[in-house]
Amino acid sequence: MPNKKIRVLVAKPGLDGHDRGAKVIARALRDAGMEVIYTGIRQTPEMIAEAALQEDVDVVGLSILSGAHMALFPRVVQLLRDSGLTDVLIVAGGIIPDEDVDTLHEMGIRGVFGPGTRTDDIVGFIRENVS
């Protein structure tokens, strides 16, 4: 199916209640022709992994501003793997210190985008990395 739309789950793990950035990204991905499932705020890692499995997504995008990324993201990645979703592209955005980026890449988060990243850059990254 060469013209299959890329399916992206956009999720806000943890107690972070600020979702403006996630909604901007979700809109940009939709405008770029992708199918977007937005889970809303205050999602547990288990809820995110279950939604990714149920929705048969190509990409999981995690948005966080609370600083809890090093606690929450590894759990999401592990649950996705445990669910058999080993080929899903995982990306993350939000307030993520530069010193954490390499560790996030090592755990399987392929793209990490900070404040001010152009939406076109995120769209391009997803298109280039979804097989």
Positions of predicted regions on the chain:
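Acidic, glycine-rich flexible loop/linker segments
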Residues: N129-S131
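N-terminal pre-triad scaffold of radical SAM enzymes
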Residues: A11-L15
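Cofactor-cradling patches in redox/metallo enzymes
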Residues: A22-R127
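Short, flexible coil/linker segments at domain boundaries that flank nucleotide/cofactor-interacting
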Residues: M1-K5, L85
